[in-house]
């Protein structure tokens, strides 16, 4: 749903120059959808650079929505920063208990969101015009694919007899 926005962000360099954990957090804004009936907590960003990048992505999304509206096209979903802190913490190597502490998100929802994020980061790793961004995206995906997230990928596999 955010393909055009992601492509524009890549073209504008909004995903460039970030460390893997911050890139994971920023890219999570394209995949995460707040589903709780309670309002989301205020977003957390690890640095002023990450906060500013999110704001630039948000401005670009708003501009894209305005153009889509004028053209009577379906609107691109706006980015949501509600998973930024969790993605950043998990990519930085924090324990699952610490990541989910004080969060209104089940372990299963965390894993589902992490897997969607890993998939998108791998795609960014393939298409990012900046080689450093492509490499950082691949590293971020690798850093997210651990613990319960990687274990959930082998559950249900059948061993041939």
Region roles according to the model:
Residues 1-161:
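Non-catalytic terminal extensions of ATP-dependent helicases
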